[in-house]
Amino acid sequence: MDMTNAQRLILSNQYKMMTMLDPENAERYRRQQTIVERGFGLQMRELDRDFGEMSEDTCRTIINIMEMHHALQVSWGNLKEKQDLDERRISFLGFDAATESRYLSYVRFMVNTEGRYTHFDSGTHGFNSQTPMWDKYQRMLAIWQSCPRQYHLSAVEISQIINA
């Protein structure tokens, strides 16, 4: 990320204000402030990720993943015979903060800002699954989208989806 000294000063001041406005993430903002002030090239690349772009297709895929989990929860709730299905297995875990931070950020935006899927339990880590989930969700989506009644899933269909 190439910035003039004036741009770096402005961004540094923004991070300083954020430490005061958001004490929970103050340490992260202090670190970013130091990186910007001192112009550490390697770490400045990290900031590029914060200002990255997410394609419309990726956004739609994440919404589809969240909608699939909503359908799983609705279907599970409607089952008369739950068989061996564990309710925790149908919960939406989110994405891995270390490797899927953009996806995680979009989920948090959808829930906290847009007010969608607020019934999902964000857990103690705010939808940070702490393990990569993208590939698993893709397999689950493929099975869910092939089901004829996506919001009236049988126990067998739910099991197939969560075991994908």
Curated annotation (Swiss-Prot):
Pfam families per the UniProt record, alphabetical: YfbU (PF03887)
HAMAP family: UPF0304 (MF_00762)
NCBIfam families xref list: PRK05445.1
Family stated for the protein in its record: Belongs to the UPF0304 family.
Protein name: UPF0304 protein YPO2563/y1624/YP_2374
Organism encoding this protein: Yersinia pestis
